[in-house]
Design a protein with these regions (language model features):
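Short amphipathic alpha-helical heptad-repeat segments
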Residues: 2-14, 45-55
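Acidic, low-complexity, intrinsically disordered interaction modules
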Residues: 24-27, 36-95
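Charge-dense (acidic/basic), low-complexity helical/coil segments
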Residues: 95-98, 105-106
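Short acidic DE-rich linear segments
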Residues: 106-113
Length: 113
C-alpha cells in the first residue's frame, strides 16, 4: 500500500471514528482514531520502533502542542507505540499508559463544527 492509499484509508477510519463518537461509542471512536494514526504514520512508527529517538522526541513534544489536532494525533501515535511489543521491549522503562480524555473531547469538537 502506498502513502496515498494509506492516507485515504486513514481518512475513512477517522470519519468512522466521528460517526462512532456521534452515537456515543467513545471506545470504538478512540480505537478507530488510533487505527487511523497507525495507518497514516506507519513508516514513522517503524522508524521509532527501530530506534529513531529523534523522531520519537518530535512526537512526544508534539503531545504538548498548542494545536489540538496535532496534540491528539501525537497522543494517539504514542498509544499505538505503547501497544506494540517491539516498542515496549526497547522503551518500556520510559513509557507508561496514562488515561487521556482529550481524544474524546477532540472527537466531540470536530463533530460539532
Amino acid at each position: 500500500m502506498n502513502q496515498d492509499q494509506r492516507d485515504k484509508l486513514a481518512r475513512v477510519l477517522i470519519d468512522e471514528a466521528y460517526t462512532c463518537s456521534e452515537r456515543g461509542d467513545t471506545d470504538d471512536a478512540r480505537t478507530l482514531l488510533r487505527q487511523s494514526v497507525a495507518v497514516r504514520f506507519r513508516d514513522e512508527i517503524e522508524k521509532i520502533i527501530k530506534g529513531d529517538v529523534k523522531l520519537l522526541n518530535i512526537f512526544t513534544d508534539m503531545q504538548h502542542d498548542k494545536d489540538v489536532d496535532r496534540r491528539v494525533m501525537a497522543r494517539a501515535l504514542i498509544h499505538v507505540l505503547i501497544e506494540d511489543k517491539r516498542f515496549l521491549e526497547k522503551y518500556k522503562p520510559k513509557f507508561e499508559i496514562v488515561e487521556d480524555q482529550e481524544e474524546t473531547k477532540w472527537l466531540n469538537q470536530e463533530i460539532n463544527l
